[in-house]
Amino acid sequence: SNSNPKTKGDNSKDIRGFAIKLLGVDGEKCESNESGTQDFLLINTNIMPIGTLKLFHDAIYYMTKSNPLIFGGELLIQGKLVKILNLIKNMKHETSPLDVRYFSTTPYMFGDKIVKYILIPTSTYKSKLPKNLTATYLSENMQNHLKKHEATFDFLIQIQTNENEMPTNDASITWDIKKSKIVKVATLKIPIQIFATKERYKLAENLSFSPGHSLIEHRPIGDINEARVKIYEEMSKFRHSGNSEALYEPSNKDFYHIK
């Protein structure tokens, strides 16, 4: 995925997303629209520079219905503008989505602890940046990787140890790893496969991801996550309605014979 409101090619620098959907997950869920899944949503930056729900609201309001300069002033006063500029400055062309670190940026429960998630690539095979950056080079590099090699990641958590220095309602603040080390809890393996097929693209288009697709024990917390759950649900309904498709929860059988 990308963060730009308009779809752009892979040759445009942007924030990239990574979503994981576990199947066959039994237990009480935060949202009732999927009963057997657990989703993890991450992006390739460890913060959301705007940070707070109020500023996200103001961003939409001032950029669409009022004067964007007012919002720029608000960002400057609250110290967010420099974070946005630094993020833009540090954007680069990635070699492949399978070679990138990803972060949840927002917090979740982990039993009685509050954590953030981190995904670190560990594959032996690494893609190379092509000389000609086409609009589909990331997809092509990912497909070339998975044709002959599996992709692997370490899935880690970072536990909140100080609620003032590691707030739940400001995603622009980095949780200091010197004060809370990251801990590996799982390995993610993506097997050798051909994913660029009509059937797989159709399945992907029918899927919905949300922080709310979660066990209560791993529920999303904080203002931003609360808003995301509601917004993602409405966006999914809108997208499925536009495609004349019903909302759909996948199961293991969807992947047994897919081409």
Where are each of the predicted segments found?
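Active-site-adjacent core segments of small-molecule enzymes
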Residues: 1-259
